[in-house]
Amino acid sequence: SESDVDVCVMLRDTFHTDYAQGKGREDYGFKASDFTFQEYRNLVKKALQDKFRTEYVYDGNKSLKIDENTYHVKADVVPSFQLRNYYYENSLDPNKYIEGVWLQAKTGEIVKNYPKRHKANGIAKNNNTNYQYKKLVRIMKHIKNEMVEDKKTDGDKITSFLVECLVYHVPNNVITGYSTWTETVKQAIIYLYNEIKDGHHTEWCEVSDMLYLFRNRKWTDEDAEQWLVTAWNYLGYGE
């Protein structure tokens, strides 16, 4: 987000699950809970209002927003349930799972992600590119933000998260192979455009490697391809 601070408040006592194939709650000794996500979100909101005063705390779609004042900075607080993924490693052990987060947006959209794996994979790629990967991510996000401000792209579809995931799929030798950022950005756009155009992107995942990037998302591969073309022209590479 564009806030100064992002905080996830995850509840572990109540959790959602992706079970191993053919398995269910009873196989792991779990019981259903009647504690809803909306009840939890309301409790977190009340706690924030008690701490920061009601007029500074309000609902966003996925997060609770805290406005800045002279005593604290602007923040996004994301209430979530723990997500336990047993499916990925076909685990039948209740204590062996990949941890993610599960939340329900105000629109009703169910959101799952895996921030710990996202972070670990991002660090690994950054290390393997001599710390150039995260720099390229920042540059590409900045370009995207400027394009949104100039009304050259749709920020609701071309999100910062999508941009980061696209850059994650740029090969390390492309990220490290050029002496200027101008050329690196140019070659990254060329690579991504060609891969999507040729259909080599269908198995791409998020940075976490847990969820497909172009399946059942609010963006499509056509959106990403069009953004790359628009960015190419926006940066003057086509001149």
Can you annotate each of these PLM segments?
Residues S1-F37, R41, V77:
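Catalytic metal-binding acidic patch
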Residues A32-T202, E206, E225, V229-Y237:
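Catalytic cores of NTP-dependent nucleotidyl/adenyl transfer enzymes across multiple folds
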Residues T202-N216:
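Short helix/strand-capping connector loops at secondary-structure junctions
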Residues K218-D223:
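C-terminal helical/tail subdomains of lipid-metabolizing enzymes
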